[in-house]
Amino acid sequence: NTGGKAPRKHIAHKQAKKSSAAAATGGVKKPHRFRPGTVALREIRRFQKSTELLIRKLPFQRLVREIASEFKNDLRFQSSAVLALQEASEAYLVGLFEDTNLAAIHAKRVTIMP
C-alpha cells in the first residue's frame, strides 16, 4: 500500500445510468425554459420602450359603445374620439399599475392583488 487514493469506480456506473435514462425516454430533449421572472422582466423592458396601444382597438370600441349606451342610445363616435379615450385609459392604467407596484414593493411583496 502506497497510501494514495483508490481510483473511483462509480463514475463509469453514473455515466451508464445517464445514457440508459436518455435511451429509455427515446432521447427526447426537454424544451428550453427561462427562469421565473426572466420573461416578465424582458416584457417590461419591451413595453416600456414601445409607444403603441396595448389594448386591441375593436374590443375597446365595443366597451366604449356599451358604456355610452347606458346613458343615451344611438350615439355616434368619431374614430379620433375613441382613440383619444383609449390613449387616456391606457395612460391611466399604466400609472395605476406603477403606483400599485410601488406600494407592493413598499410592503415587501412581489405580487399585486386587487
Curated annotation (Swiss-Prot):
Q: Which domain of life is it from?
A: Eukaryota
Q: Where is the composition biased (Low complexity)?
A: 18-28
Extent of the signal sequence: none
Name the InterPro entries on file.
Histone-fold, Histone_H2A/H2B/H3, Histone_H3/CENP-A
UniProt-annotated stretches for the region Disordered? 1-32
- Which Pfam family would be a valid example here? Histone
- PROSITE patterns listed in its UniProt record: HISTONE_H3_1 (PS00322), HISTONE_H3_2 (PS00959)
**What UniProt keywords apply to this chain's record, in alphabetical order?**
Chromosome, DNA-binding, Nucleosome core, Nucleus
**Any one GO CC term of the record:** nucleosome
Database matches in SUPFAM superfamilies: Histone-fold (SSF47113)
Q: Tell me the GO molecular function terms.
A: DNA binding; protein heterodimerization activity; structural constituent of chromatin
Q: Where in the cell is it found?
A: Nucleus; Chromosome
* Bias (Basic residues) ranges: 1-17
Its quaternary organisation is: The nucleosome is a histone octamer containing two molecules each of H2A, H2B, H3 and H4 assembled in one H3-H4 heterotetramer and two H2A-H2B heterodimers. The octamer wraps approximately 147 bp of DNA.
Tell me, in a sentence or two, what this protein's role is. Core component of nucleosome. Nucleosomes wrap and compact DNA into chromatin, limiting DNA accessibility to the cellular machineries which require DNA as a template. Histones thereby play a central role in transcription regulation, DNA repair, DNA replication and chromosomal stability. DNA accessibility is regulated via a complex set of post-translational modifications of histones, also called histone code, and nucleosome remodeling.
Q: Which family does it belong to?
A: Belongs to the histone H3 family.
Name used for this protein in its record: Histone H3-2
The organism's taxonomic lineage, starting at the top:
Eukaryota, Sar, Alveolata, Ciliophora, Intramacronucleata
